[in-house]
Amino acid sequence: MNTVFNFSSGPAKLPIEVLQQAQQELCNWHGLGTSIMEISHRSDEFRQVAYESEQDLRSLLNIPDNYQVLFCHGGARAQFAAVPMNLLGKSKIADYIHGGYWSYSAAKEAHKYCQPRMIEVMTYINGWRGIKPMVEWVLSPDNVAYVHYCPNETIDGLTIDELPDFGNKIVVADFSSAILARPIDVSKYGVIYASAQKNIGPAGLAIVIIRDDLLINRASTKLPSILNYQLLANNKSMFNTPPTFAWYVSGLVFKWLKVQGGLVEIEKNNRAKAILLYNTIDNSEFYYNNILPVNRSYMNVPFYLANSALDDLFIIEARNAGLYALKGHRVAGGMRAALYNAMPLEGVKTLVQFMHNFACRYG
């Protein structure tokens, strides 16, 4: 089989070692004669999977003891609703930092449950797009329920690497496309949530990391049980049947990350991949990227051809060369390469060589 490199932004590439282990165990998991997909989530065997998954994630992210880890249904879009429904309390106002498509989408969903105050932080300087430094963000007074932002915008290719320092405000972050890509200080956040299908595992699962004090006396009485953080925490994420296969594969990914050397090594690899691709774009007149270097995402690299009439041909020839899912999002156009943890440096080198060859032939 020819080597294929999948640059999809999600569902995204999984580590080949994880896929091979899941394949090997699929029909006879741990000698039980049955699949992991068929055993009860309340069995001792699956409870061990759940326990190890949580402990490995805690180890990777250095999650403090006063935080709960929830394995939830529904991906990040479900959390767009769950966050305000769980956290509003007496205040019906929340600050939403508008740094791109997904932060705007979160605010739009939250509007059904609260009054989101949109804080514009995007900047445009001589055709370059970027994000204002946090010190320039004009937040609401202290009576807001929380401050929500998205550290990495997959469609826009924008990242916010600064750690939030907003005093006593509760900070909520959508880390869907940045979780496990580098070390983070979890204690700076009240809630971190992330859909699985980018850097964690298969689609259908979301992980929520929430500080203990935010589980008490905040949730709306009309909150659906499946979205109730306190109820999920009290039942160890098993109030109802969880997405067990996605949970299991995510656990394998956590173990794979530890074998790679943890998040310090993962960050080095991710930066090396992104720098190689950005340098190729910047040193070419055939391709361009309009994001300020300080705000360029290391996970999602959008780029454009100077001659957009060649876009479709680029996609076709790239796929023929084993480079999949490079077409940009429908709202942004152009190209986009997702460089999540499972993408090897070899994949980016292959993409860069293809880009050189394509530019030589059509430039």
From Swiss-Prot:
Q: Which reaction does it catalyse?
A: O-phospho-L-serine + 2-oxoglutarate = 3-phosphooxypyruvate + L-glutamate; 4-(phosphooxy)-L-threonine + 2-oxoglutarate = (R)-3-hydroxy-2-oxo-4-phosphooxybutanoate + L-glutamate
Cofactors required:
pyridoxal 5'-phosphate
Q: In which pathway does it act?
A: Amino-acid biosynthesis; L-serine biosynthesis; L-serine from 3-phospho-D-glycerate: step 2/3; Cofactor biosynthesis; pyridoxine 5'-phosphate biosynthesis; pyridoxine 5'-phosphate from D-erythrose 4-phosphate: step 3/5
A GO biological-process term: L-serine biosynthetic process
List the EC numbers from the record: 2.6.1.52
Query: How many cofactors are bound and how?
Result: Binds 1 pyridoxal phosphate per subunit.
EC supergroup of this enzyme: transferase
SUPFAM superfamilies listed in its UniProt record:
PLP-dependent transferases (SSF53383)
Q: Where does pyridoxal 5'-phosphate bind?
A: A76, R77, W102, T154, D174, Q197, N240, T241
Sequence similarity: Belongs to the class-V pyridoxal-phosphate-dependent aminotransferase family. SerC subfamily.
Q: This chain belongs to which protein, by name?
A: Phosphoserine aminotransferase
Lineage, broadest ranks? Bacteria, Pseudomonadati, Pseudomonadota, Gammaproteobacteria, Candidatus Palibaumannia
* Encoding gene per record: serC
